């Protein structure tokens, strides 16, 4: 990775972790709307720097789970499992969209991220918290749908419009 890519990864990691910590009350447990996840679809167009940044950001942000009242014995598992889910989901989105600005491919990439996070986090989190598996899948899916498929897709479209304007030099 070039220095520019490393810097972008660091900025995205800090932004993701900062949002998780700042919005800790709604960023943890089975029923959550993790606003930081609205950034994940950017990996479809930003590529590896975003995949790495959101993976590291999730690990760091999830370590702060103790602040949200997560049992301390679950925090390291959540940090590892969540960052793996982010890595896999963001990588899959990047591969599906392949840097394309085609709206169908971009939308499909948001569903891929949601599916991966629901499958991984929705499976281990209820087991850690002693809840039924269906509750984990439902809760994580609903929160991810809101944060990734709705908010994240809108963030992605806004990013693409802003990037297009900056290259054209128009306001």
Model-derived regions: residue spans:
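Membrane-embedded alpha-helical hairpins and interfacial helices in multi-pass inner-membrane proteins
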Residues: 21-31, 35, 59-171
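Interfacial helix-start motif at the membrane-water boundary
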Residues: 44-54, 70-78
């Amino acid at each position: 990775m070039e220095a520019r890519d490393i810097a972008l990864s660091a900025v995205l990691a800090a932004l993701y972790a900062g949002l998780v910590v700042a919005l800790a009350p709604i960023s943890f447990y089975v029923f959550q709307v993790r606003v930081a996840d609205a950034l994940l679809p950017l990996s479809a167009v930003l590529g590896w720097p975003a995949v790495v940044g959101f993976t590291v950001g999730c690990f760091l942000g999830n370590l702060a789970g103790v602040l949200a009242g997560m049992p301390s014995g679950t925090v390291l598992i959540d940090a590892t499992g969540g960052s793996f889910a982010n890595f896999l989901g963001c990588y899959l989105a990047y591969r599906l969209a392949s840097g394309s600005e085609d709206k169908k491919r971009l939308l499909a990439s948001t569903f891929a991220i949601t599916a991966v996070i629901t499958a991984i986090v929705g499976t281990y989190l209820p087991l850690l918290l002693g809840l039924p598996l269906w509750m984990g899948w439902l809760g994580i899916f609903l929160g991810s749908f809101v944060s990734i498929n709705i908010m994240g897709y809108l963030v992605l479209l806004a990013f693409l419009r802003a990037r297009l304007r900056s290259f054209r030099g128009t306001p």
